[in-house]
Design a protein with these regions (language model features):
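Short, well-ordered secondary-structure micro-motifs within conserved domains or adaptor modules
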Residues: 93-133, 153
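ANL superfamily adenylate-forming
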Residues: 134-144
Length: 172
C-alpha cells in the first residue's frame, strides 16, 4: 500500500520504521532534511564535506549526530561497533568509514569541533541548519578559509566546495 503498511494504516510500525530509515538516509546523502518552497518544489541545500570532531561522545549522541556529517570523529569512551552493527543494515553507506577515532587524520573540507556533553536542543538546531548557515554567510566565498565559533562549535573551513551535483544520479 501507499502508506508502507496495511491499507489504511499510515502510521503502522512498518511505515514508521521505513519512514525513519529513509529520513536518516536522506540526511546522510544530502546533509539536511527535505526542504520545499511554497509551491512544494524541492529546495536543494548545499552539501558540504563536513566532519564532526566530538569529545565526550556516547552511543546516543552518535546515533543523533552521525547522519548530519560526512565523517564523525569520536573519542572511544564506548564501542562504536555496536552502533555500526545495529545501523549498517539500514543504509548502503559504509558506516565504518564514516565513524572514526578522534585521533584519526581529518580530511574533511569543514571541521566542526565540539564537546558532546554540551550539546543542547539549540545547538542541535545549529547542526541541522549548518549548510544553510554556511551558504548564507556573505563572508564565505569560494576561496574562503579560516575558523570561527558559533554556539558550542569551533568551525574550521579548509574548502567551501559543495557536492550536491555529484549526488544526482541520472542513468539512461
Amino acid at each position: 500500500s501507499f502508506s508502507g503498511g496495511k491499507p489504511g494504516e499510515v502510521n503502522s510500525k512498518e511505515w514508521q520504521y521505513t519512514n525513519h530509515k529513509n529520513i536518516r538516509n536522506f540526511i546522510r546523502k544530502w546533509g539536511s532534511m527535505v526542504k520545499h518552497d511554497d509551491l512544494m518544489m524541492p529546495i536543494v541545500v548545499p552539501k558540504y564535506n563536513i566532519g564532526f570532531v566530538v569529545k565526550n561522545c556516547n552511543e546516543q549522541l552518535l546515533e543523533i549526530l552521525e547522519p548530519w556529517c560526512s565523517t564523525i570523529y569520536i573519542d572511544h569512551s564506548f564501542d562504536a561497533k555496536d552502533y555500526i552493527d545495529r545501523e549498517q543494515p539500514n543504509t548502503l553507506i559504509d558506516l565504518s568509514d564514516r565513524i572514526q577515532s578522534i585521533h584519526a587524520e581529518k580530511n574533511n573540507d569543514i571541521e566542526v569541533r565540539f564537546d558532546g556533553s554540551k550539546l543542547t536542543n539549540d545547538s542541535f538546531q545549529v547542526i541541522q541548519q549548518l549548510p544553510e548557515i554556511l551558504s548564507n554567510d556573505e563572508g564565505i566565498e569560494d576561496d574562503t578559509v579560516g575558523s570561527f565559533e558559533l554556539d558550542i562549535f569551533e568551525i574550521m573551513i579548509y574548502n567551501t566546495k559543495t557536492y550536491e551535483e555529484e549526488l544526482i544520479k541520472c542513468e539512461r
